[in-house]
Design a protein with these regions (language model features):
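N-terminal Sec-pathway targeting helices
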Residues: 1-16
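N-terminal cap/lid segment of alpha/beta-hydrolase-fold proteins
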Residues: 29-76
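Short beta-strand element of the alpha/beta-hydrolase
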Residues: 77-88
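Serine-hydrolase catalytic-loop signature spanning alpha/beta hydrolases and amidase-signature enzymes
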Residues: 88-91, 113, 139
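Short amphipathic alpha-helix adjacent to the substrate-entry channel of hydrolases
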Residues: 95-114
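Alpha/beta-hydrolase active-site loop
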Residues: 125-145
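Gly/Ser-rich "nucleophile elbow"/oxyanion-hole loop immediately N-terminal to the catalytic nucleophile
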Residues: 141-156
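Gly/Ala-rich beta-loop-alpha elbow adjacent to hydrolase catalytic centers
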Residues: 158-162
Length: 163
């Protein structure tokens, strides 16, 4: 019994030391050097037709609280697909390659698309990024009529930290 307590205590102590010793700047530098895409998709892969709203602010909390919104031409409000980028809360942004591929696919299938940017760990501690995404969704719901998509038909997805 003492052995189990010792092991569990050691694991907890290691976790606490790891959390206290976590260096956001070191992680950002490492990931930035690893994730430096040299290939950008051409403009036709991003959006073609309809309206594009890039770096649309959804909150005044941070200059990083913006989203990119793409709405195809349509007589009727269409569903909105929301992408939340990944990156372990330390890198990436709303204009990632995955977002560009999403725009290409969904524009051809009659969906509006939004890609949400949020504060990363270097700027604000968790759960700031999650709170930012909630703010973005409230903004998108409140402005659905203005931008021409249906506030009752949202889908949200993401990868890694965005999932």
């Amino acid at each position: 019994m003492k052995k189990k307590g010792f092991i569990i205590g050691g694991i907890c102590l290691a976790a606490i030391v790891g959390i206290l010793g976590y260096n956001h700047e070191a992680v950002r530098v490492v990931f930035h050097n690893v994730y430096s895409p040299s290939v950008k998709l051409d403009d036709s892969s991003k959006w073609n037709g309809g309206k594009a709203y890039e770096k649309l602010p959804y909150s005044e909390t941070s200059e990083n609280d913006y989203l990119d919104l793409y709405v195809p031409d349509s007589e009727e409000p269409m569903p909105l697909i929301i992408l939340v980028h990944g990156g372990g809360f330390v890198y990436n942004d709303s204009q990632s390659r995955q977002a560009q591929l999403m725009y290409r696919y969904f524009r051809d299938h009659g969906y509006a698309c939004a890609s949400v940017n949020y504060r990363l760990a270097q700027e604000a501690a968790f759960p700031a990024g999650v709170e930012d995404v909630k703010s973005a969704i409230r903004f998108l719901r409140a402005n659905a009529e203005k931008y021409g998509y249906d506030p009752e038909r949202f889908a949200i997805w993401g990868e890694s930290a965005g999932g």
